[in-house]
Amino acid sequence: EQVMHIFCQDKKLNISPAYLKPGFAFGGSCLPKDLRALSYQAKLHDLQLPILTSILPSNELQIARGLQMIVEKGNRKVGILGFSFKAGTDDLRESPVIEVIERLIGKGYDLVIYDKNVNIARLVGANRDFILNRIPHISKLMVNSTDAVLEHADTVVIGNNDPEFREVAKRVRDDQQIVDFVRVLDGRSSGVNQDGLLHKTAAARGER
């Protein structure tokens, strides 16, 4: 964390710390599609673009690592906080959290999901058809409050960095665990172990 803080002090080339800080897998309607298009065009012209062609496989490893961290907790009841591809949007296209959810469903996990932006989109948004037609099985797992997630889950997964989830994490019970994909919680002040993606238990709240 201290090393990353130093890197992010550059204000000339680094227009935003978000470009340098490590995070979870990316998604959305643009970047994955653009990478596939560039890689395809490179193959057509017999060009080697090792950096570009390694990005999507690397992204897949991040998704697999996130799933592994949940599985390692050993709890079958899981609550997901945020599953749009980033905070503040209802866009679910190529969301990496959806891929994690699909794999958990395949493994028989008992899931509930909360995302306030997607809850609204399910009723009136442009993504309504996507939610109802492409992922109806996931839509059925959605709940309307963070309280419902905390009541259900033994493992709570923070899927995007909505500021709301920082406050929710403070209400996690001692017998619950948190897997934080996006560093919503501040590991520097918690003294918690960090292993790849940031994961936290009750110690993250300063408890002993």
Region roles according to the model:
Residues 1-208:
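Structural/interface elements that position substrates and couple domains in central-metabolism enzymes
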